[in-house]
Amino acid sequence: MKLQGKVAAITGATAGIGRGIAEAFLAEGASVALMARNATKAEAVLAELGVGNRAVFIAGDATVQADVEGFVDKAAAQFGKLDILVNNAGGATGLQPLVDLSDQSFDEAMKWNVYATFWACRRALKTMLAAQSGRIINISSVEGKHGKPVLTAYSAAKHAVNGLTKALAREVGTQGVTVNAICPGLVITDIIRNNGPDTAKAMGMSFDEMVDMFAQESAIKRPNTVEEIAAVAVLLASPEGGGITGATISVDGGSAQY
């Protein structure tokens, strides 16, 4: 098992990519602390995972600094150390043309995607630098490499996450800590199913038309899967990933080429 005995803290971990990464880490022998806002859903996920005390839920809102920092502290305290941080919480907000985008919507995109990542990284580094060992994996987006109409705030936020990733990797590279970002393309998760219709409407098309448009932008002409994202996260967290840092890895079926 590639992650035997390792401890991971994962934000936004009860569904979609976050849950997929949690499942993959558990399968490789890690223990995981999961942060999410919905306690009822989180407890149901823990029961479904069925791994006993190797997985714990810690309530928190990624847009609240005290919650994010408290989550990192509690995860380390629960398991006695912290080896891996996965910043998965985030998402698209402010789905309007820029001329209609409010300051509040832009701020929300930054807080959910950028500040949540910043707060968690800063807190986790206190433990990781003391141990001279750690892996930070930020879940960004293909929109952190290019942009799309009405996704201006989200694209700006994910560009910021990628910039933070690259700079921090150089800052801590000689201290045993790697920092990377995974940039997924289209992945059909619950949040996409729930929020996608509004995005599609803002773009002047149906949800199915939007999904097909995004899929056709890729070389493989289909959405990526959660499992494909999780496999890259396992590599970055594993001993084999020790030489990878400062990378913004596209798992997008080739859409970042276009």
Annotate each language-model stretch with its function:
Residues 96-98, 102-110, 136, 214:
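Substrate-binding pocket helix/loop in short-chain dehydrogenase/reductase
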Residues 28-44:
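Conserved glycine-rich Rossmann-like NAD(P)H-binding loop of the short-chain dehydrogenase/reductase
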Residues 7, 14-16:
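Conserved glycine-rich cofactor-binding loop
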